[in-house]
Every structure is written in structure tokens, then in C-alpha cells.
């Protein structure tokens, strides 16, 4: 019989990352840079989202050799991505002992109808969301941590801002509702009624919600924290910059001290050029990774 972790334990692991930065890395060297810069965790990948976007084709789980290399290189938690709905990729990563699995729209979905039943796993999961409906559906499936979808690999923060603001606005709306209005709101959002009741009672989501997708500068990271993010994922931004080590430290500092504008100004000096970035309106519908999943 497969073991499963309790929600309390899995969500507690996510709470421990609160206020921190999680960085995408593709090898042991990058993982060490991230750890030394103060990252609370790393995401082991074969290619960062910008390279996945540029290469096209089918993006799958990283080679286990890369994941193991990163796990052996650092003492901080290691996450890895599995395709949406790909049961075996997730089980393989769990068997390898990763600390967290990201059921990620950055990779090509394996199942366009069903997400993983994350309640059946011992390892905790993080999932992306654009609104409260997506957020609560993923939580009901067993996600222990959420993140904005943003638009990965673009270096453009606009979609992450949109998603964070939308989720938080919808949470505030639910909190202000009377109990007899909640069932209709659950129907409108496609959200489990019991979770909306819990959100109304607690005044917040039952799991942490990080910012992800388009964080490219220290100011971007600070912006997302001000908008209510519990922490920040940085994908392509750090290792696509001119000075990754300095850039990584600046992102971590800006995330921690997100209202210290003089410090953020100093952190932003002489970082070199940030990743070039992509204007969202130039993307074709099929290039929009955030549309993957439901």
C-alpha cells in the first residue's frame, strides 16, 4: 500500500519556505550559487523556462541524473517538475526523494483533462493558479503550495501581477460574503464549497501562494511581495542575467526587505542587463503556457 503524507505535514513544509526565494537551476554549479545567495530551495530542471519556450517541441521531466546532481550538491530542499497529469513522472521524482514536485504548465501537459490526484502521494506538491477557482481545485486535489502561473520564460511580470491580484481580490470577496451566497460563488468559480467556507472563516487561503512567472529584477520580486505573495519563484531571470551570483543575492535581499526602497535601489545598481524578455501581447495563443491546465 502506498504511503501518503498528511496535509498538515505537507503544508507545514511549504510554510517553512515562506518569505523566501526558490530558484530554477540546471546543474550543481547553479544550485550552489543559489544556495550561497540565500535561496530557500531550488528547482532542478533540464532547461529554464526561457530555453524551453525558445526550443519548442515537447518539454518533459528533467533527466534524473540532473535532479540527483542538484540534490547531492546542496543542503536546501530540491524541487523538480512533472508534467500535468503524468502519474509516472511524479512517482519517479517521489521515489528519487525530491522534497517537492511542481505539477507544472511549463512542461508539455501529459493529460489535458485531469491533473494528478496529489492526495495519494507522500511528497508535497506545488501547482500554478490564475484565480481562486484554479487555486481551490488544486488544493482539493492535494496541492500543499500554490504559485501564480504568470507567463514563464518571458521576463515579463504583468501576468504574475494579474494572477496575484485576482486571487487576493476573490479571497476578499469570499470573506465578505454571507454563508448563503457561498454555494453560488462556488458554482461560479468551479470551487469546492467546503474550501470556500474555510477561506471565509480563516480570511485567507489554506496554503501559501508564491509569485512565479516573469520575475526578472529585484524590484519585480519586491512588487510581488507587496501584492501579498508569500515568497517568490525565479525561473529564467537569474541565470539569464549577466551576473547570476550578484543577481541572485539581490533578488533574495529585495524579497526580504521589500519595503526598503533605498536598499532595493542599491541592490539594483550595476547588476548588468536583465534577461531581454518578451512582450505578452506578441505571444500566439498556443505559446501561452499559463493556459495549460484548468
Swiss-Prot record:
D-ribose 5-phosphate binds at residues 24, 153, 214, 235-236. PROSITE patterns: PDXS_SNZ_1, PDXS_SNZ_2. Pathway: Cofactor biosynthesis; pyridoxal 5'-phosphate biosynthesis. The keyword Endoplasmic reticulum does not apply. PANTHER family: PYRIDOXAL 5'-PHOSPHATE SYNTHASE SUBUNIT SNZ1-RELATED (PTHR31829:SF0). HAMAP family: PdxS. This is Pyridoxal 5'-phosphate synthase subunit PdxS. It comes from Bacillus velezensis (strain DSM 23117 / BGSC 10A6 / LMG 26770 / FZB42). The lineage of its organism: Bacteria, Bacillati, Bacillota, Bacilli, Bacillales.
Amino acid at each position: 500500500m502506498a504511503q501518503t503524507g498528511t496535509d498538515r505535514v505537507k503544508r507545514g513544509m511549504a510554510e517553512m519556505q515562506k518569505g523566501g526565494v526558490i530558484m530554477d537551476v540546471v546543474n550543481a554549479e547553479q544550485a550552489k550559487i543559489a544556495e550561497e545567495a540565500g535561496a530557500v530551495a531550488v528547482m532542478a530542471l533540464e532547461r529554464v523556462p526561457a530555453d524551453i519556450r525558445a526550443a519548442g517541441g515537447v518539454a518533459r521531466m528533467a533527466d534524473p541524473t540532473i535532479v540527483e546532481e542538484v540534490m547531492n550538491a546542496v543542503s536546501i530542499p530540491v524541487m523538480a517538475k512533472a508534467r500535468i497529469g503524468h502519474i509516472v513522472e511524479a512517482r519517479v521524482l517521489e521515489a528519487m526523494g525530491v522534497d517537492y514536485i511542481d505539477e507544472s504548465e511549463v512542461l508539455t501537459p501529459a493529460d489535458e483533462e485531469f491533473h494528478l490526484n496529489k492526495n495519494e502521494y507522500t511528497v508535497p506538491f506545488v501547482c500554478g493558479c490564475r484565480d481562486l477557482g484554479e487555486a481551490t481545485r488544486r488544493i482539493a486535489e492535494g496541492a500543499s503550495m500554490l504559485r501564480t502561473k504568470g507567463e514563464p520564460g518571458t521576463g515579463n511580470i504583468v501576468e504574475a501581477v494579474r494572477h496575484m491580484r485576482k486571487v487576493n481580490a476573490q479571497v476578499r470577496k469570499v470573506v465578505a460574503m454571507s454563508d448563503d451566497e457561498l454555494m453560488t460563488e462556488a458554482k461560479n468559480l468551479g470551487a469546492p464549497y467546503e474550501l470556500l467556507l474555510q477561506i471565509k472563516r480563516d480570511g485567507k487561503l489554506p496554503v501559501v501562494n508564491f509569485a512565479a512567472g516573469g520575475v526578472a529584477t529585484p524590484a519585480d520580486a519586491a512588487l510581488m511581495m507587496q501584492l501579498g505573495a508569500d515568497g517568490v519563484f525565479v525561473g529564467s531571470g537569474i541565470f539569464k542575467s549577466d551576473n547570476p551570483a550578484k543577481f541572485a543575492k539581490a533578488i533574495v535581499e529585495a524579497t526580504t526587505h521589500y519595503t526598503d526602497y533605498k536598499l532595493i535601489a542599491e541592490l539594483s545598481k550595476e547588476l548588468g542587463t536583465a534577461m531581454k524578455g518578451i512582450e505578452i501581447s506578441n505571444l500566439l495563443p498556443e505559446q501561452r503556457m499559463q493556459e495549460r491546465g484548468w
